[in-house]
C-alpha cells in the first residue's frame, strides 16, 4: 500500500505518527512549505521559534516547489506540482489533512480523475457555535465534496460528531485517534514536592484562556494556606503576557511563575514536577498537551470547549471538566483536587491508564 500524505509543513505532533506508520506501510509525505525548518517569528507566541532538525527523520518526504511566499495560510504557498509528485502512478491513496483550503479541494478532485482513493483527516468539532448560515454552507460543501472522498479519519468523539452533523455516513468514518509518543512523555518516578504544583502550557493568547486560570488562582489565594502550598507554572509566550504579568503583580499572586517558551523536550521536565495540568481554552479542536500530561501521570482539568475532553477526561476519575470561560467554576474544581491528596494520586494513576489505551 502506497500512501501520499499531504501536509502544509513539518509539525512536531505529526512527525512521530508518520514515523510510526512508516514501519508497516509505505508512506511518503509531500510538504508545501519548509517554514518550520528555519527560525521564524510566531505571531501568537510573540517570539522567534528555533528550528527542530528532527522533524524529517524516519520517513520519506518531498518539498513541493512553489512560487511566491512559503508562508502557510489558507491560500499560500502556491504550487502546481500536483501530478508529478502527488498523483503519480504508484500512489494508491491520497491522505489529506484538512478539507476547507483551496489546495486540498483541487487535489481531491484531481485524485478522483486519476482514480486514487482519498482519505481525509480534520480537527473540526461542533464545540464552537457557528451561525445558521455558516452551518448551511458547510453542509452544502460536505454534500458535494463527500462524493469524492472514500473515508474520513476521526481524531476523537467530537470530531466524529462533526462529520455526522454535516451528513457524512458513519460507515465512512474510521477512528485514527490524535496521539503523542506516550513512551517519550512517560515518567516512572514523579518528582516529589511539598507543594501542590499546577501546570499550564501554551500560547498566551485569548483563545488559550490562561487569564481564566490566573483569575481562578486569584480567588483561591484568598486562602493563605493555599497560596503558600501551591505553585502554578506557566509555560509559554504570547501577546497577553504583559497584561497577565500586570494582573499577577497587582494582586500579589506570588505563587504564579512564568518560565517562558520551552521546546517539547524541555516541557517534559515540567510535567515531571507537577501533579495537575489545566487546559482552560475557550476554543480547542483537540488539545494534545492533555495527552502529554496524562502520559506523564498528571491529573487533568479542562474546559468544556476542549475537543479531547469527551475522550480523555472523566469527571471525578482522572480530573474534572469546567464550564467554558468560567473562572469561578475552575476555582471550585481546582480546590476539590487540592483538598484531597488521595483523590489527586488516584487521578494521576487513572490518567495514565486512560492514555495508555489511546496510543
Residue spans for each PLM region:
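Short alpha-helical donor nucleotide-sugar binding micro-motif in glycosyltransferases
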Residues: 261-262, 269-274
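A short, well-ordered alpha-helix in the C-terminal region of glycosyltransferases
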Residues: 329, 336, 343-357
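Short hydrophobic beta-strand element within catalytic cores of glycosyltransferases
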Residues: 299-303
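Aromatic "clamp/platform" in nucleotide-sugar-dependent glycosyltransferases that forms part
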Residues: 282
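Nucleotide-activated donor-binding/catalytic signature segment of Leloir-type glycosyltransferases, i.e.
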Residues: 242-262
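Conserved donor-binding/catalytic core segment of Leloir-type glycosyltransferases
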Residues: 191-208, 212-217, 233
Amino acid at each position: 500500500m502506497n500512501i501520499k500524505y499531504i501536509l502544509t509543513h513539518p509539525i512536531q505532533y505529526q512527525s512521530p505518527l508518520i514515523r510510526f506508520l512508516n514501519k508497516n506501510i509505505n508512506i511518503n509525505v509531500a510538504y508545501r512549505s519548509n517554514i518550520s525548518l528555519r527560525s521564524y517569528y510566531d505571531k501568537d507566541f510573540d517570539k522567534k521559534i528555533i528550528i527542530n532538525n528532527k522533524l524529517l527523520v524516519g520517513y520519506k518526504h518531498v518539498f513541493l516547489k512553489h512560487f511566491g511566499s512559503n508562508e502557510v495560510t489558507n491560500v499560500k504557498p502556491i504550487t502546481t506540482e500536483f501530478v508529478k509528485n502527488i498523483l503519480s502512478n504508484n500512489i494508491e491513496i491520497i491522505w489529506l489533512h484538512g478539507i476547507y483550503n483551496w489546495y486540498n479541494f483541487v487535489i481531491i478532485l484531481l485524485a478522483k480523475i486519476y482514480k486514487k482513493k482519498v482519505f481525509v483527516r480534520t480537527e473540526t468539532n461542533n464545540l464552537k457555535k457557528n451561525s445558521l448560515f455558516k452551518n448551511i454552507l458547510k453542509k452544502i460543501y460536505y454534500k458535494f465534496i463527500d462524493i469524492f472522498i472514500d473515508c474520513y479519519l476521526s481524531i476523537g468523539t467530537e470530531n466524529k460528531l462533526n462529520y455526522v452533523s454535516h451528513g457524512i455516513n458513519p460507515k465512512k468514518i474510521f477512528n485514527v485517534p490524535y496521539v503523542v509518543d506516550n513512551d517519550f512523555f512517560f515518567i516512572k518516578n514523579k518528582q516529589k514536592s511539598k507543594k501542590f504544583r499546577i501546570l499550564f502550557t501554551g500560547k498566551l493568547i485569548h483563545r488559550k484562556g490562561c487569564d481564566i486560570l490566573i483569575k481562578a488562582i486569584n480567588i483561591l489565594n484568598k486562602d493563605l494556606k493555599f497560596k503558600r502550598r501551591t505553585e502554578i507554572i506557566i509555560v509559554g509566550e504570547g501577546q497577553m503576557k504583559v497584561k497577565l504579568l500586570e494582573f499577577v503583580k497587582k494582586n500579589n499572586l506570588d505563587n504564579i511563575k512564568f518560565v517562558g517558551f520551552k521546546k517539547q523536550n524541555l516541557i517534559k521536565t515540567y510535567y515531571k514536577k507537577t501533579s495537575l495540568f489545566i487546559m482552560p481554552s475557550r476554543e480547542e479542536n483537540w488539545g494534545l498537551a492533555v495527552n502529554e500530561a496524562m502520559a506523564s501521570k498528571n491529573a487533568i482539568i479542562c474546559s468544556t470547549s476542549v475537543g479531547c475532553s469527551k475522550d480523555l477526561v472523566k469527571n471525578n476519575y482522572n480530573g474534572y471538566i469546567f464550564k467554558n470561560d468560567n473562572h469561578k467554576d475552575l476555582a471550585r474544581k481546582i480546590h476539590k483536587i487540592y483538598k484531597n491528596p488521595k483523590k489527586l494520586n488516584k487521578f494521576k494513576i487513572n490518567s495514565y491508564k486512560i492514555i495508555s489505551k489511546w496510543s
